[in-house]
A protein has these predicted regions:
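Bacterial N-terminal signal peptides that target proteins for export
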Residues: 1-9
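Exported/periplasmic cell-wall-interacting domains
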Residues: 59-62, 81-207
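N-terminal signal peptide c-region/cleavage motif recognized by signal peptidases
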Residues: 17-19
C-alpha cells in the first residue's frame, strides 16, 4: 500500500500526464543542417518552415532549451544599421559600438515576434537569403513567425540540432504547405506588430 505522500505524488503525475494529453503541448525543433524549423504538437510535426540560422563565427547554439520570453516588438540591443538624415542606409551591418559619422545615427534592427530560447538568442521574423547568415538568432518568414509566436508559450521546449555544412546552397521553400496553421494564427490581429512592415537590409544584416 502506498504511503499518503507517494499516493499524492502519483496522483499529481497522472493528472499532469492527463492535462498534457487533453490540452496538448507545442514544441519546436530546429534543424541547422536542412535549415528548417518544425512546429510539433504532442510530438507530432504539424508545420514546417524554412529558417536562416547563425553564420560561421556566430553559430546558433545546439542543444535542448526552452522559450525564456516572448516580445512582439523586440529590437536588437547590439545589431542594426547606420542611416543618414534622409534615412538612407550608410552602413548595412553595423553594431551599437560602431562610430557614427556626423549627420548619421544608429538604428537597432527590428526582431518582431521574438522568442528567446537562450541568452540573447531567439527565433523572430526576418530576411531569409537562402543560407545561414544571422548573428546567431533563427530568422523565420513572417507568416511562420506569427504562427510560432502564438503557438509556443513561455517554457515550450526548443531542440536545436545539426550543423551548417560548408559550401552548401539552400533552397528556401516558401510554399504554403501549412496553410491550415497559417490561417489559424496569421489572421489573428492580436499578433500583429505595429505596421507589420519588415524592411531588411539588402544583405540581411539583422540578427
Amino acid at each position: 500500500m502506498l504511503s499518503p505522500t507517494k499516493s499524492f505524488a502519483l496522483t499529481c503525475l497522472l493528472l499532469g500526464s492527463f492535462a498534457r494529453v487533453v490540452l496538448g503541448q507545442y514544441s519546436v525543433q530546429l534543424d541547422l543542417t536542412e535549415q528548417k524549423a518544425y512546429l510539433l504538437y504532442n510530438d507530432r510535426a504539424v508545420m514546417q518552415s524554412p529558417i536562416c540560422s547563425g553564420r560561421p563565427g556566430h553559430l546558433t547554439p545546439s542543444g535542448t532549451f526552452h522559450i525564456i520570453r516572448k516580445d512582439l516588438n523586440h529590437v536588437s540591443s547590439i545589431y542594426g544599421r547606420i542611416v543618414d538624415r534622409w534615412k538612407r542606409t550608410v552602413v548595412v551591418d553595423a553594431d551599437v559600438d560602431m562610430p557614427t559619422p556626423a549627420g548619421t545615427r544608429f538604428i537597432n534592427a527590428p526582431m518582431h515576434y521574438f522568442m528567446e530560447f537562450a541568452p540573447g538568442i531567439g527565433m523572430h521574423a526576418g530576411y531569409l537569403p537562402g543560407y545561414p547568415a544571422s548573428h546567431g538568432c533563427v530568422r523565420l518568414p513572417e507568416k511562420s513567425a506569427i504562427a510560432f509566436f502564438q503557438a509556443l508559450p513561455v517554457g515550450a521546449p526548443v531542440t536545436v540540432f545539426g550543423a551548417i555544412p560548408r559550401n552548401r546552397q539552400y533552397q528556401v521553400n516558401n510554399r504554403d504547405d501549412n496553410q491550415r496553421y497559417y490561417d489559424r494564427f496569421y489572421n489573428d490581429p492580436r499578433y500583429y506588430y505595429r505596421g507589420r512592415v519588415i524592411t531588411p537590409g539588402p544583405f540581411g544584416f539583422w540578427q
